[in-house]
Amino acid sequence: MNELLRDDIRYLGRILGEVISEQEGHHVFELVERARRTSFDIAKGRAEMDSLVEVFAGIDPEDATPVARAFTHFALLANLAEDLHDAAQREQALNSGEPAPDSTLEATWVKLDDAGVGSGEVAAVIRNALVAPVLTAHPTETRRRTVFDAQKHITALMEERHLLLALPTHARTQSKLDDIERNIRRRITILWQTALIRVARPRIEDEVEVGLRYYKLSLLAEIPRINHDVTVELARRFGGDIPTTAMVRPGSWIGGDHDGNPFVTAETVTYATHRAAETVLKYYVKQLHALEHELSLSDRMNVISDELRVLADAGQNDMPSRVDEPYRRAIHGMRGRMLATTAALIGEEAVEGTWFKTFTPYTDTHEFKRDLDIVDGSLRMSRDDIIADDRLAMLRSALDSFGFNLYSLDLRQNSDGFEDVLTELFATAQTEKNYRGLTEAEKLDLLIRELSTPRPLIPHGDPDYSEATNRELGIFSKAAEAVRKFGPLMVPHCIISMASSVTDILEPMVLLKEFGLIRANGKNPTGSVDVIPLFETIDDLQRGAGILEELWDIDLYRNYLEQRDNVQEVMLGYSDSNKDGGYFAANWALYDAELRLVELCRGRNVKLRLFHGRGGTVGRGGGPSYDAILAQPKGAVRGAVRVTEQGEIISAKYGNPDTARRNLEALVSATLEASLLDDVELPNRERAHQIMGEISELSFRRYSSLVHEDPGFIQYFTQSTPLQEIGSLNIGSRPSSRKQTNTVEDLRAIPWVLSWSQSRVMLPGWFGVGTALREWIGEGEGAAERIAELQELNRCWPFFTSVLDNMAQVMSKAELRLARLYADLIPDREVADRIYETIFGEYFLTKEMFCTITGSQDLLDDNPALARSVRSRFPYLLPLNVIQVEMMRRYRSGDEGTAVPRNIRLTMNGLSTALRNSG
């Protein structure tokens, strides 16, 4: 570990320890220290896990609470220190004169230059460019704004301390260092006395606010900045013919994802859309206010355009002190109009004061953009480019990036849910008594007829629909209302999860038509919403291209696609495919599905846009975004990629401006490189794909033999992980299962992966791979040759390299000695011992196979920074796990007093914070 980083972690840890001793008493501090020292001894091989178990055996739950909080706070502070040093090292690397590191725009520009990429190629990519991080809710990301604020202040103080320590000794004063430490201590004291998590189950509205918090922390500033930087640099390098598209345009599922979540309603759609719009409109007002203050330019000192003079005269600011300051008068009027816009769209209660009431609201973003362009043009006319390129340029970029909607809210529902609603609508309208009972061909005929006619299916008045149907219709109604208010980009996507047929994709189109989001016109419907199938099981991934081919053979749908710029978005489900088939089989099924989709779209002249439903963990498609995008097949990106971001990953990526910039830059860099640079040429592509297919099949068999076929597996999983507690302790707003069944198939992906992460098995990220590789390599004469084949693929094929690297990353965070403690919670010892031994054996076989193929001695040999990070976290992960096991044991024995469930929640949050990608 970097010495400065180690010093910072020790420094913050020392202050935290002193705060704990002061606030909780020396006995609590000693208990924390004893646990920490014991964990270090275990890490160094000087003690066994039992010694830490003894520390907490029989502990009073009330005494366990401050210990769990202590290690959670230490994880928070360690993360803060790591982020600070990552940003500093990145800055140092960029300013060192050495070649810029991968995943930076500087490196991307060099690669494009070296490859001789022309302006025509760039223009074609940028014309359709879209890089969309889509924020989704997550049960472990429940930290309060107070905690974020404290982290922000501590980060700023640590930066100030670094600057001071970098000065020569004679140029800094001890008193200033003491002041900084006093302020850090005060912030940590406030943090210690603040509840880290809320006890009540979070409402959808709470989750919306958590998502919006990241915009205020970083995204409102950093998304416009990176879009501006990319636009300026592309124009400089490739000329003025490059479209000025805002590449990064964010999305959200929070409040619109009602797949299996009964708490998403018409009201949450309204809340999510209105709060998003309110956030961005108030941001514009704030920036206009700052511009009004800054642009004190006098028309006695420079020339202004006629358009600006007209704008200034309409600004309703006749103060004598402003008479010669046209920019201030113009922007005053723009601010008044933006406040009036906020009042008109959100409500007057959202705006302080009444002075804006004499102004006319902006009718749309184009009017606001026209005014901003007038100010920009006037400044440039008078050679004030340096002024125009600052705050005004960022505001113009913000408008291009966010519009009046901030983000695009996706609607998502399970295909069965859409079918249920239509079955009831058709029956009530006496169009078809039993839609669900029709054949696929009969359903198709009926759906096409409905989409061809403007006649509404829902009668006027108050039809007697079921509660579920009314909820669904309410969601669509409020989505349509939001589009009318905030523009078509407010709700531009409708996702069908578990899509497995053509009718699954057409069914929501009928509902969209009912509310005007699609308009019937015979065989030529028009609309503002992309209908997106989500292929998420292994079988559906394999059949996805065939389903789309059938869909595109329907004239009505193909015509709709053409008026949507011929773009077909497809979402790929990393989570459910992994749960269905295991890590390797899912990764190959996804890659193979992309190959088929790319080939199909190329042949049918359709623009493919892929939406990657990745979670934070490798078991849910996680891993470095830059590497993941570059590992896609050629043609799968083409300037556009959408990807889900959730949980601790959102906090880690977008919790402060520096990390937000770094991660947004990685997404943009990878998208440009994947779209414009030649693909890696495999020596024998057909053979490589054959190998992957064979290993995938072997891995699937091994995974299925445990997860789907072993009769004791469900018992092992439900009793050796905190799954039961996730379901019963208000962890997240969404139920943990789609249906009230006791099967892996119906369990949601987040609790599936979160449970294995908490118990430190990380099973979804590796199980089955070791056996598959060993069986494929075989024994005897051909084994060495097959190992050599795999080693060559690892060297030259980003897909295979990424699969192995991500697997190694997640395996490095597993701890099988802890998994044994969780297995001991199972009453049936035969099941506990047998399945634990199966998992234990597969883990070490997988590690052995990884080392054989990569030539490594250990899992993270090629990533020493991550290896050091994982090792440094070990001492505060262990106590959290051991406390969690002890509390789970008591909770399941009937101890439901306040402290026991509270400690389970605390340890879940602490482990998620420390692991940084637990679900």
UniProtKB/Swiss-Prot annotation:
InterPro entries in the record: PEP_COase, PEP_COase_bac/pln-type, PEP_COase_Lys_AS, PEPCASE_His_AS, Pyrv/PenolPyrv_kinase-like_dom
Pfam families: PEPcase
Recorded name of the encoding gene: ppc
Protein name (database record): Phosphoenolpyruvate carboxylase
UniProt cross-references to SUPFAM superfamilies, sorted A to Z: Phosphoenolpyruvate/pyruvate domain
GO MF term list: magnesium ion binding; phosphoenolpyruvate carboxylase activity
Disulfide pairings: none
PANTHER family membership: PHOSPHOENOLPYRUVATE CARBOXYLASE
GO cellular component, one term: cytosol
Family of the protein in this entry: Belongs to the PEPCase type 1 family.
Function description: Forms oxaloacetate, a four-carbon dicarboxylic acid source for the tricarboxylic acid cycle.
Essential cofactor(s): Mg(2+)
Catalytic activity: oxaloacetate + phosphate = phosphoenolpyruvate + hydrogencarbonate
UniProt KW keywords: Carbon dioxide fixation, Lyase, Magnesium
Active site positions: 138, 579
E.C. no: 4.1.1.31
GO biological process: carbon fixation; oxaloacetate metabolic process; tricarboxylic acid cycle
